[in-house]
Amino acid sequence: MIRLTTKQRFPPFVRKVVRDFSQMTVGQEVVEETESVIVIKNLLDLTEIPFENTIKHMFVIAKTMHDDAVTALETRNMSLAEDVVKRDMDVDRLNWLIARQTNMIMQNASLLRKMRISTTLAMHYYIISWIIERIGDHAVRMAENTQPIIYLDLDKKILAAIKKASSLSMENFDRSIISFFNADMKDANRNIESIHSLEAICGEINNMVLKQDTLVAIHVGYIAESVRRAGEYSCDISETVINLLIEKENGPP
């Protein structure tokens, strides 16, 4: 429970911060509010929400955000680009949920038995959650950089290259999550090795935009950068999978 007090009365910005916090977190609700007291309480039993379900939910949201950012650029859909930006809070909320669950587990060993999870696996879930949150952030950057050029006539070759790079990036994302849930070290290694194809295409995009006007060159360059970073973050998930499997194989020290 969080209890906020003041000797006088809360200024409007404090109440806004409290509302924003309640909206961006899972289960945290204002249960008492006066001029000088605000009480926030967790109304959700976090132990009843499996880590696996949350990760899968985050994956679907982040991947859809990425795909929609590219679709918005291709179809000149401003409302879709704006919606991608708004969805970022959904990923942030779920990342916060896993962070809170992990913190609870580290402080109370009995929760490990209740949630049927080890501290090692919980920490790896948290790491993967953070990485997915970063992939969502790059989808937002793609959508934000789409908006200034959305109504311009983008070179078809550049658009095709962005779509190809995006497809490779999300294939990496798919494989990284699959390798995690399947505990597949070989697939995780193959995923890491495949990043070179994505990096090559993103390099080609950066060369293509040199012939474009400054506005297009800048924003397409940022889009390509975020597509590449999403793929690289996916490789980070694969590296996490490998580390987890090695730890399991070696057992406790």
Task: Please describe what each predicted stretch is.
Residues 1-253:
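Cytosolic, long alpha-helical scaffolding segments
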